[in-house]
Design a protein with these regions (language model features):
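Residue-level detector of short, conserved catalytic/binding motifs and their immediate flanks
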Residues: 102, 182, 436
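Structured, hydrophobic secondary-structure cores that serve as assembly/anchoring elements
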Residues: 1-54, 316-459
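A glycine- and small-residue-enriched flexible loop/hinge signal that marks low-structured segments
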Residues: 41-44, 169-355, 366-369, 373, ...
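Small/polar beta-strand repeat architecture
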Residues: 56-84, 91-134
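Glycine-centered structural positions embedded in regular secondary structure
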Residues: 26-29, 127-128, 249-255
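Small-residue-rich
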Residues: 1-56, 131-223
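Short, surface-exposed beta-strand/loop "edge" segments at domain boundaries and coil↔beta transitions
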Residues: 32-38, 78-81, 119-124, 190-198, ...
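A structural detector for beta-sheet-dominated domains
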Residues: 11, 28-30, 44, 65, ...
């Protein structure tokens, strides 16, 4: 229209899309799938795994001599030559003494050897060979989906190799793809791998937001120390079958199933139900279960003490003795404060009616966003205590904190514009504001309850 009386300027304020990192988990595969190395494949149901599992390879001959079996495959097997021992599973042979899972040395592109003390005899029926990790991965993913609906998971293929090869490949993947996966369920064979402990040490910081779910044993769990906030470990029950290589898969499922909200607050990890997994029995095991619990480990127990027949997670700890919810809450607060404040800054630069500027009003806006985030944390079962706001200088805030003023509360402090600019005279020029501080206590659950009972004859 020519010569309009009114012009309308339009800006758009967009809400942040939820950050889904804490719902992202992955199983480690070492040659169990047909996908390329460093490939992440999303699995939404068990049948998705079936289509990518490696098929057995035909063996053309197997011979025995002086305690060593030599296997020749019909086609090149694809296992790395000279990289150390690799666990392979042989099946379908007659005599059956050649069947089983063995630590194999790859000698050529079509041959490998393994130690076999007794000569099974001449082969009359040739069988097949497959990476041992295929069965393990299939069982773990089967048990994962047995926990319930509503969860998907990734498979990260690291390629066939030794446990050390797998750790090296995962280390490189994590360096190249930070913040991609929140939790990994690692193969039980990694429990004895020294390089894995080095990898764990790289993600022990309070900001790491990465967790490893580990299957260990009563003889080796002491490897996992109080520094390892990024590890949750579990010892399988002695009666767990071969189809249950990693009982901790139930805890892994629960960890990435969390999606806290006002209608679904975060529940404690301890005593959550698991399905299809083998619980420890108290008969003859009380001492070791007490030791596992005292060492901040986890195990599958029974709900019988509460009159419930379901198997449950006992412990719910990270290796540094914290309840799992402690670190989940800290991660959630980091992720969502970043998300919500960044969203406010971006929207503020695209709002012509009320742009976000570096002044007291702008600081007030950012503080209100942080307050809203922490109010959600409280409502979602992540933070203990009511949310309060303060606008104190750095010195005054430190004094109040040291005096215990914020005990039992969640405080969101914003250093006022004038005092902050005086304390940090170069920051205004470069647009940097470091004046928002949040103090909160992660919401935890009960672990043990003591009831005092006094029986009296006084009437």
């Amino acid at each position: 229209m020519a010569n309009p009386i009114t012009s309308v300027k339009v800006s758009q304020t967009l809400p942040p899309a939820p950050n889904t990192l804490q719902r992202t988990g992955a199983f480690i595969s070492q040659g169990a799938t047909t996908t390329a190395q460093d490939t992440l494949t999303l699995i939404t149901q068990l049948s998705d795994l079936t289509t990518i599992l490696t098929a057995p390879q035909a063996v053309s001959s197997i011979t025995w001599s002086s305690g060593t079996a030599t296997v020749t495959t019909t086609l090149p097997h694809g296992y790395p030559v000279g990289s150390g021992t690799i666990n392979l599973t042989l099946a379908g042979f007659t005599p059956i003494g050649y069947n089983g899972t063995f630590a194999c040395t790859i000698t050529t592109t079509t041959e490998f050897t393994f130690a076999l003390a007794v000569d099974p005899g001449a082969v009359t029926v040739e069988g097949t060979v497959i990476a041992a990790d295929v069965a393990r991965l299939n069982y773990d993913v089967t048990n994962f989906f047995a926990q319930g609906a509503g969860n998907s998971v990734y498979i990260l293929e690291l390629g066939v190799g030794t446990t050390a090869d797998g750790v090296t490949t995962l280390t490189a993947f994590l360096t190249a793809n930070p913040g991609t996966i929140y939790a990994f369920l690692v193969p039980p064979t990694w429990d004895s791998e020294a390089a894995f402990l080095t990898l764990i040490a790289s993600y022990e910081s309070i900001t790491a937001k990465l967790y490893f779910f580990v299957t260990t044993t009563t003889a080796t769990y002491s490897r996992y120390t109080a520094l390892m906030k990024d590890v949750m470990w579990m010892v399988n029950a002695p009666t767990a079958p071969a189809t249950e290589p990693s009982s901790i898969v139930g805890m892994f499922w629960q960890w990435i199933y969390n999606q806290p909200s006002s209608s679904n607050p975060l529940a404690p990890m301890n005593c959550r139900y698991v399905y299809g997994l083998t619980p420890w029995t108290g008969l003859g095991n009380n001492t070791i279960l007490t030791e596992i619990y005292a060492a901040d480990g986890n195990y599958i127990g029974s709900g019988a003490e509460g009159g419930i027949s379901n198997a449950i997670i006992r412990g719910g700890f990270t290796a540094d003795s914290q309840q799992a919810n402690y670190w989940y809450a800290i991660d959630w607060v980091q992720i969502n404060l970043d998300l919500d404040i960044s969203n406010a800054v971006i929207n503020g630069s695209n709002n012509q009616a009320a742009p976000l500027l570096y002044n007291q009003a702008g600081i007030n806006t950012l503080q209100s966003v942080a307050v809203s985030t922490m109010q959600n944390a409280q409502t979602y079962g992540l933070s203990l205590g009511n949310v309060v706001t303060t606008q104190l200088s750095a010195t005054a805030f430190a004094a109040s904190y040291n005096a215990g003023q914020f005990v039992g509360q969640t405080d969101v402090n914003a250093d006022p514009f004038l005092s902050y600019s005086t304390e940090n005279p170069t920051h205004y020029k470069i647009g940097q504001y470091n004046g928002i501080s949040v103090i909160f206590t992660p919401q935890l659950g009960f672990e043990q309850i003591v009831i005092n009972v006094n029986a009296t004859e006084v009437v």
